[in-house]
C-alpha cells in the first residue's frame, strides 16, 4: 500500500508543477513497462494493483498504456492495453473496465520471457507518448533493470527524453548482488546516466521506507 500512496503523491506533485508552467497541454500520459523475464512474472500481481490505482487517478483526455518487456520490446505488439479516456464518465468507465479485463487476462496467461529488451521498451514508450502529445509524460519501469538481449540486437541508442519523467519501480536485487553489490549499484547508475543524458528525469522507488523523500528530493 505504501507504493500505491507514493504513486498518488507523484501524480499530485506533477499536477502542482504543471500549474506553474506556461499554457500547453495539461493532460497526462503514462506508459507502464512490465518485466516478464524469469521469476519476475511473480511480481505482476503487485503491478496489477498499480494499474488499478492509475485507472482511478487518471482523468478525461489522459492516456494510459501497459506493455510487456520481452525479447524485442520496440514494437506495438508488446502493448497489453492502451486507451485515452473519454470525456463522458459512462464511456470512461467502460474503457477502465475493458482495461482491467485485459490486464487480468494478461497476468493469468503471461509466460516468462527469456530476454529483457528494456531499452526497446523505453523507446517504444517515448514514441507512444510523443504521438499522444500529452502535457506530462511518465514512463514507469517495473523491472529489476537487468537487460539481456539476444544476439544481433543493437540497443546502444541515445534516448531522447526531454520532458519525460522516468520512474523505476521494484528494482529487485539479483542473487549475484550478494557476491558483488557493485553490480546492483552500477545497474542503477547506468540507467540514470542514460536517461539524464537523454534529457529526462530519473528516480527509483524501491526502498519503501524512504519513498517520500526520494520523490520530494
Predicted regions and their residues:
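Sec-dependent signal peptide recognition
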Residues: 2-9
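C-terminal motif of bacterial Sec signal peptides marking the signal peptidase cleavage site
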Residues: 15-18
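Bacterial signal peptide processing site
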Residues: 20-22
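VWA/integrin I-like adhesion module and closely mimicked acidic/polar interface patches used
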Residues: 146-190
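Von Willebrand factor
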Residues: 26-136, 138-140, 172-174, 208-212
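Exposed acidic/Ser/Thr-rich ligand/metal-binding surfaces
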Residues: 28, 112-163
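Von Willebrand factor A/integrin I-like adhesion domains
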Residues: 181-217
Amino acid at each position: 500500500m505504501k507504493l500505491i500512496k507514493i504513486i498518488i503523491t507523484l501524480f499530485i506533485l506533477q499536477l502542482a508543477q504543471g500549474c506553474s508552467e506556461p499554457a500547453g497541454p495539461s493532460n497526462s500520459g503514462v506508459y507502464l513497462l512490465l518485466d516478464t523475464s524469469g521469476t519476475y512474472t511473480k511480481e505482476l500481481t503487485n503491478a496489477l494493483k498499480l494499474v488499478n490505482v492509475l485507472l482511478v487517478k487518471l482523468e478525461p483526455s489522459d492516456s494510459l498504456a501497459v506493455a510487456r518487456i520481452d525479447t524485442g520490446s520496440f514494437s506495438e505488439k508488446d502493448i497489453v492495453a492502451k486507451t485515452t479516456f473519454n470525456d463522458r464518465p459512462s464511456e470512461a468507465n467502460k474503457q477502465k473496465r475493458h482495461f482491467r479485463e485485459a490486464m487480468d487476462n494478461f497476468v493469468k496467461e503471461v509466460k516468462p520471457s527469456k530476454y529483457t529488451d528494456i531499452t526497446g521498451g523505453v523507446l517504444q514508450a517515448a514514441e507512444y507518448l510523443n504521438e499522444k502529445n500529452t502535457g506530462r509524460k511518465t514512463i514507469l519501469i517495473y523491472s529489476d533493470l537487468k537487460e539481456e538481449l539476444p544476439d544481433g540486437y543493437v540497443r546502444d541508442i541515445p534516448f531522447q527524453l526531454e520532458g519525460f519523467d522516468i520512474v523505476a519501480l521494484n528494482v529487485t536485487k539479483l542473487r549475484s548482488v550478494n557476491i558483488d553489490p557493485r553490480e546492483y549499484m552500477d545497474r542503477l547508475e547506468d540507467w540514470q546516466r542514460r536517461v539524464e543524458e537523454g534529457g529526462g528525469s530519473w528516480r527509483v522507488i524501491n526502498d519503501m521506507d524512504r519513498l517520500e523523500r526520494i520523490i520530494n528530493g
